[in-house]
Amino acid sequence: MAVISMKQLLEAGVHFGHQTRRWNPKMKKYIFTERNGIYIIDLQKTVKKVEEAYNFVKQISEEGGKVLFVGTKKQAQESVKAEAERAGQFYVNQRWLGGILTNYKTISKRIKRISEIEKMEEDGLFEVLPKKEVVELKKEYDRLIKFLGGIRDMKSMPQALFVVDPRKERNAIAEARKLNIPIVGIVDTNCDPDEIDYVIPANDDAIRAVKLLTGKMADAILEGQQGVSNEEVAAEQNINLDDKEESEQAETTEENTSVESN
């Protein structure tokens, strides 16, 4: 059974590309036709590519890896945050701050500041500090949460990036490529697919299309996590079975020894 259906893709408007005058020739192989000056994406190829991306992301999740969701354009912000949180992953849905990946040591100091301000409020310092200073601290906190809240628990590099619109997120992609972090991306007809390891040819401007595909990547992560859980349970059950067998063998030996003694 396919990960996603043609019907789902059609209903979400995934097939609508950009105007023919705004295209990247490298996307030609993913284009089905042109209609009224707009390129129509070949959804048969999209179905296949979604499946490839899904399996890759699921494998990362099965191995305990993390995925950083990146989508700062207005149409992607809500879906990126919601789906990343649903899958327990990291996200950046506002401006990409330079160095999030390549200079994480500096970024982590700014993230640490979030906890520092929270502790100040918890300890009651806001009650004794001058009102103007408290206002400035709250502004600083809101700004930090806005840009870094989605990665505040990211203690190490993610094992993959999921990106909505490579043209918009070129800085994030450049950092990921520098660190050899694989990239999965929703790639429209005006983008360069060569920058992306797992291309999902699709409309990156329609909210429904972005939500559908971002949701599928979150589903892949959750399925992978379930696989990890099942393996852990199975391992525990095997250990318990081994212990039970050893216990039963010991009891049998004791019974035999007792019978022989009598």
UniProtKB/Swiss-Prot annotation:
InterPro entries: Ribosomal_uS2 (IPR001865), Ribosomal_uS2_bac/mit/plastid (IPR005706), Ribosomal_uS2_CS (IPR018130), Ribosomal_uS2_flav_dom_sf (IPR023591). The keyword 4Fe-4S does not apply. It holds the Pfam family Ribosomal_S2. Residues 243-254 have a biased composition (Acidic residues). Coiled coil: none annotated. Residues 228-262 are annotated as: Disordered. One of its GO terms (biological process) is translation. One of its GO terms (cellular component) is cytosolic small ribosomal subunit. It comes from the Bacteria. One of its GO terms (molecular function) is structural constituent of ribosome. Keywords: Ribonucleoprotein, Ribosomal protein. PANTHER family: 30S RIBOSOMAL PROTEIN S2 PROKARYOTIC AND ORGANELLAR, SMALL RIBOSOMAL SUBUNIT PROTEIN US2M. Belongs to the universal ribosomal protein uS2 family. HAMAP family: Ribosomal_uS2_B (MF_00291_B). NCBIfam families: rpsB_bact. This is Small ribosomal subunit protein uS2. It comes from Staphylococcus epidermidis (strain ATCC 35984 / DSM 28319 / BCRC 17069 / CCUG 31568 / BM 3577 / RP62A).
